Every structure is written in structure tokens, then in C-alpha cells.
């Protein structure tokens, strides 16, 4: 009976430890995030650094504020789904940005001191691996 209780206690402690480690990893997954789009006539840039969201239009700051922990958690999850070591080698579905048929877009993710820069892609047609993050960042008109 004591052995069964001890096993249950150890399983419970292991689960709590795993959750705490996962939670710490989630909140430290990225230090900075940038989503930039540019065409011949305009540019947009979204930066998230130390939990502060800033959006620029044609190099002028439009809005800036601190993100809620839930929003940072969502962004961390989306970033966590991307293989950052291959972010600059992804296959893009279209390249209309080359003749200004679409806005050129790039995503940059900073983890620690390392910055991962995506392959350039059409703003409205990102690579499938970047689509959830790109769509979420594009919809953040806060």
C-alpha cells in the first residue's frame, strides 16, 4: 500500500516538474519577433521585444503597448512549431514580390543572442510552415 502511494506521489511530482519546465520554456522561447512587409509604395513592420508590441507604417510608429501573457503564450506556441534552423531555406509558394505583385515579407525570430531570418515570401502567400505565425501577426491590429 505504501509503495503504491509512493509511486503515485512520484508520478505527480514528475508531472508537475514537466509542466513547470514546459511553462518556463514557453515563456522564454523568443526574445524578439519582427514581421516586415514592403512594396514600392508602402511598408509595415510589427516588432515584439520584451513583451512590447509596436506597429510601424512607412517607418512611423502607429501603435505600441505591452502584450498580455496569453498573447505572448500564443506567439511562443506558434514560434515553437517552426523549425528555425531551416527558416531561411523554406520553399515559397509564389514570388510575386519580385515584380511588386505582392508585398515582400520577412519574419525574424530572436532566441537568446541568435536571430533567425526567414526566406523572403509574398505577404499574402507565406510558406506553409510560417503561415500560422504570419497570419496571426498580420491580424494583430491592436
Residue ranges and their predicted role:
Residues 55-58, 116-118:
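Short small-residue beta-strand/loop micro-motif enriched in glycine and branched aliphatics
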Residues 3-5, 20-38, 76-78, 89-142:
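Short, well-ordered, aromatic-rich surface patches in folded extracellular/luminal domains
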Residues 18-56, 62, 66:
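N-terminal export/targeting and maturation segments
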Residues 50-53, 68-71, 120-126:
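A short, sequence-level motif marking secondary-structure junctions
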Residues 8-15:
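Bacterial N-terminal signal peptides
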Residues 62-91:
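Mature extracytoplasmic domains of secretory-pathway proteins
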